[in-house]
Regions:
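Charged low-complexity intrinsically disordered patches
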Residues: 1-66, 146
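Sequence-level detector for tyrosine residue identity
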Residues: 4, 9, 23, 28, ...
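A generic structural signal for ordered alpha-helices
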Residues: 19, 33, 37, 72-79, ...
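Short, cationic/aromatic linear interface patches
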Residues: 79-146
Length: 146
C-alpha cells in the first residue's frame, strides 16, 4: 500500500494531453508565478494571500486544461485561446481582478465562474476600466474645485 502522506512518495508532475505533448506543471507554475508577480502581489496585499493563491491555482488549472473547450460566461471558447490569454496575464491584470471583486455589489453564486470571466476579459477590458476611473475622478475633481 502506498503512503501518500509520506514525503518520500512523489508523483510525476507531467500531464499528457490528447495529442501526446507533455505539459509540465512545474514549468507552467514558474511561468505563471513570474508573469503575475505572485510574491509582489502578496507583499502589496498582505491580507489576501489565500485569495491570491486561489487566483494563481485557477490560472494554472485553466492553462493545464485538456478539454477541447472551456466554458466562460456561458460561452464555449477553444482551450488554446483561453490558455493563450491566461498565459499573458500579468500583475496589473490580477490587480484589476481584485478591484473588480472589491467593487462588485451583487451576490456571486459561483465564484470560480466569476473569476474565470474576470481573468479571461481582463486583457480586453483593463484599459477601458482605468480610463473610466480617471474620467470619473477628474470630473469629481473639477466639480469640487468650483
Amino acid at each position: 500500500m502506498i503512503n501518500y502522506t509520506d514525503s518520500s512518495y512523489t508523483e510525476s508532475n507531467l500531464i499528457i494531453s490528447d495529442n501526446g505533448m507533455g505539459y509540465d506543471v512545474d514549468k507552467y507554475t514558474k511561468i505563471i508565478r513570474e508573469s503575475i508577480e505572485l510574491e509582489l502581489l502578496k507583499e502589496n496585499y498582505p491580507h489576501e494571500h489565500e485569495l491570491l493563491d486561489g487566483i494563481f491555482y485557477l490560472i494554472l488549472e485553466t492553462v493545464l486544461n485538456k478539454n477541447d473547450t472551456i466554458l466562460i460566461a456561458s460561452n464555449k471558447y477553444p482551450t488554446e485561446l483561453v490558455r493563450d490569454k491566461f498565459l499573458k496575464l500579468n500583475y496589473m491584470h490580477i490587480n484589476y481582478a481584485l478591484h473588480c471583486m472589491d467593487n462588485n455589489t451583487t451576490k456571486v453564486h459561483n465564484i470560480k465562474k466569476y473569476m474565470l470571466t474576470i481573468l479571461f476579459n481582463a486583457p480586453s477590458t483593463i484599459s477601458g476600466y482605468y480610463q473610466a476611473e480617471v474620467s470619473h475622478d477628474y470630473q469629481q475633481l473639477t466639480v469640487n474645485s468650483k
